[in-house]
Amino acid sequence: SKELLEGFRRQGFAVVSVNYRLFPKCKCPDYIDDAAMAVAWTFENIEKFGGNKEQIYVSGHSAGGYLTLMVALAKEYMAKYGQDADKIAKAYPISGQTVTHYTIREERGLPDGIPVIDEYAPMTHAGRGGAPMILISGDRDLEMLARYEENAHLQALLQNFKHDSVLYEMQGFNHGTVLSPAVALISADIKKLWKQYQKQ
């Protein structure tokens, strides 16, 4: 999202903006592979641009939030490109689906609105460790159907497995307008973590 890109750039962060193939020109898991390949590329190349591979943070909104979760929790996708998803400093999915994405259900000809939880659902991979994360959702009364509730379910699973995670519900913000407060929240958290890293 351009709002994420510009929001983080204004905070002084080096930002790698990622595109991925879209259905119907491709099918699952091509777009998950694209996201994992991009994060792996960042680990391999960010130091050439003055970045620090120990300080790589991953975020995305909506479908990008789903891909953020899959890259961080389903570690086999990063491993395919020779990188360890556990090396991600922190993940910040914004309003991401935590069940199998509705695009995948559409590919299978399944009806809209009925959740599927299989290997393409981020919550399936809870309990396997992974990067610390902040789950961010819009207001449960303004978000897309069950989006807050899905994130709350994932957070409950992560907490059960002692995963370093927290869920923020941005009250008064819908699926689209959640981006502005999300950028502020994420930026503040990264700056705090950067200060801690520098003291090590």
What spans do the regions from the language model cover?
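Loop/turn elements at helix/coil->beta-strand transitions in domains of secreted/extracellular proteins
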Residues: 11-16, 53-55, 86-90, 130-133, ...
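C-terminal catalytic histidine-bearing segment of alpha/beta-hydrolase fold enzymes
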Residues: 152-155, 159-200
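Primarily recognizes the serine-hydrolase "nucleophile elbow" in alpha/beta-hydrolase
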Residues: 37-107, 118, 122
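Residue-level signal for short, function-critical loop segments
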Residues: 62, 139-141, 173
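Short beta-to-alpha linker loops that shape the active-site pocket of alpha/beta-hydrolase fold enzymes
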Residues: 14, 19-23, 97, 171-173
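Catalytic nucleophile-loop/oxyanion-hole region of alpha/beta-hydrolase
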Residues: 1-5, 16-53
